[in-house]
Amino acid sequence: MQEIRNIAIIAHVDHGKTTLVDRMIYQANLVRQPENLGQLILDNNDLERERGITILAKNVSVIYKGVKINIIDTPGHSDFGGEVERVLNMADGVLLLVDAFEGCMPQTRFVLQKAIRMGKKPIVVINKVDKPNCRPDEVQEEVFDLMFNLGADERQLDFQTVFGSAKQGWMSMDWRQPTDSIAPLLDTILSEIPAPAIIEGTPQMLISSLEYSPYVGRIAVGRITRGELVSGQHISLCKRYDIVQKQKVKQLMVFEGLGKANVDKVECGDICAVVGIDGFEIGDTIADFENPEALPPIAIDEPTMSMLFTINNSPFFGKDGKFVTSRHLKERLEKELEKNLALRVKPGLTADSFVVYGRGVLHLSVLIETMRREGFELQVGQPKVLDKTIGGQRCEPIEELSIEVPEEFVGAAIEISTRRKGALVHMEPRGDRTLLEFEIPTRGLMGLRSNLLTASQGEAVVAHRFKEYQPYKGEIERRNNGSLVSIETGEAIAYSMNKLLDRGRFFVEPGEPIYGGQVVGEHTRERDLNINICKTKKLTNVRAAGSDEKIVLPPAIKFSLEEALEYIQEDELVEVTPHAMRIRKILLDPLARKRNSDNEDC
């Protein structure tokens, strides 16, 4: 029987997890090197490549010195915490990757805490030691202190540290002596990470992840914790609430390199994919046919935020997308629930609306962006934070926020955060930059990143993670400016936009199609202003021919999806179609809006 090591790679966002896995793949000669250099093999979803972040957990295996190493790449963002937790169930040890300059960041702490609670043995990899001003030795001390504070035991604190640069493709036990390969890291994995315990008995496997194939449907992925599975075997599927279904394994696959290989039998401790099981959910157990014993299901963090999803009912409905009806929207959200653990969906107040609960703006905006690329048209409301009543008191989610800014912008960063009910808990200079740590309500994070980047000339590094529920902190002021709202449907005309430049900043370019009720700009004052930017210049013979002035308009402000979601107010929606994104009022008719606001004033 082949020796196996199961290992998960955990780290803060963008410290180089996926690049490191790529290096391991090259080391094991799974890919011819020159052709794919420079692009990540594992982040194979368009969105992941564009944003440079890992969203979905992935499995790969490499053979080194005759030992099979199963590598699981995990996402670093706490918004995808649901992914991290279920993946750690499959691993025996973790590779903790830390940036040699940035050190331990909030997300490092978030993922490490989960691994330590599960009793996993860590190996610390200090990456990017080729960067100027890096401080590998200090970072190693930081990691030790962090593990100690998180309550690690002696076995976990006695960790091995490997230094290197995944990008340049070397690892070494001493950062001052570069090598020419990452072999030292692979040797450390073999010596430090325990082989999975072989437990004889009836089969048991916890389904920790799932894949989808257009040919065979849903495939269950997990690690066999006891016994062995054989292709064609009859098994029991143990679901929640003690429901047991009798089923049959049609096909078994193990991970080999970047793909999968069919096998007849999988031994205890290996990670495998099972085909032919219907109606399973993540957290179910595959157990013996006659005496089923279920494993405890996976506990996932609760959602902290909700958003209204509804079909697109604007005047431009159906011009852009393929899937536009509420039936399409409902089916797509149900399909997403199958694999997205931290998501919940409930029907909204009307038949064509749904309330979607998630872990944060990033988590939900990745879903919206994926749907947009698939050809969906939909509208999304302002994100709402979920409150809880604890002991008769209204409580809201609080996050730990860390901001790293150059010294001259510290005052601005503190002011922006405290205005949003943030409390400064720690401040530490790091070279010419300063690290600020706050406790801040989740509500206060909306729109915070764009404000901080503007105030710090794009230099701020922002990260946050959920901490706990605390008593409600009071109202937070939202943006003060009203909107410029179009009252006509047609094309935006430069002539009339030029006349309204002193009233605010525009979100649309001349020539763009707009409709009545669309938000076309930000007003300089507090109230909304209804404007007509579809008016053309009257061409009569009275005017002198040469008196036309050249119109110079400032460029329009373009939002990303997250920025738009954080920008809108309660009476606005973001309309998302495959080729456009617009902000609109919920009530398109100006008279209906006026009646509504008069009623609220009364």
Residue spans for each PLM region:
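P-loop NTPase switch module centered on the Walker A-proximal segment
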Residues: 1-98, 102, 142, 210-213
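Signal for well-folded cores of large energy- and translation-related assemblies
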Residues: 25-29, 63, 85-92, 99, ...
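Structural beta-sheet core signal
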Residues: 96, 124-125, 163, 356
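Amphipathic helical hotspot of TIR/SEFIR-family domains
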Residues: 103-119, 140
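Canonical P-loop GTPase G-domain recognition
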Residues: 121, 131-191
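Short boundary/loop segments of OB/S1/cold-shock single-stranded nucleic-acid-binding domains
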Residues: 195, 206-214, 391
